[in-house]
Amino acid sequence: MKKQLHFTPQASDFLTEQSAAVQKAFFEKLKKLSDDGLLREPDAKKIAPNLFEIRVKVTRMQYRLFYCYIDENGIWVLSGFVKKTQKTPENEIRKAIRIRKGVE
């Protein structure tokens, strides 16, 4: 069943700041997420309860976009960041959880 995507201002701002190639890669995965209702590794990973990240790699740079499920048909895209270390930064996870609480 197709899911409705909703974007927070933080997610929209992050996406518009990225190059066309990064935007294209994210929107391809977001379309698949909307159409299928879920993404699996390596395209996405569960970070915390009801918090997932979409993973994109373009020209050796890694980008992440957090999302969550709010109801049966809704997916909220919360925030994004450029990944610079092996581990997802705790401050980015806390930020996404804080944003998620605002849309729940």
Segments from the language model and where they lie:
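Hydrophobic/aromatic beta-strand elements that line small-molecule binding cavities or substrate pockets
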Residues: 65-66
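Basic, Lys/Arg-enriched alpha-helical interface segments
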Residues: 1-62, 71-75, 82-104
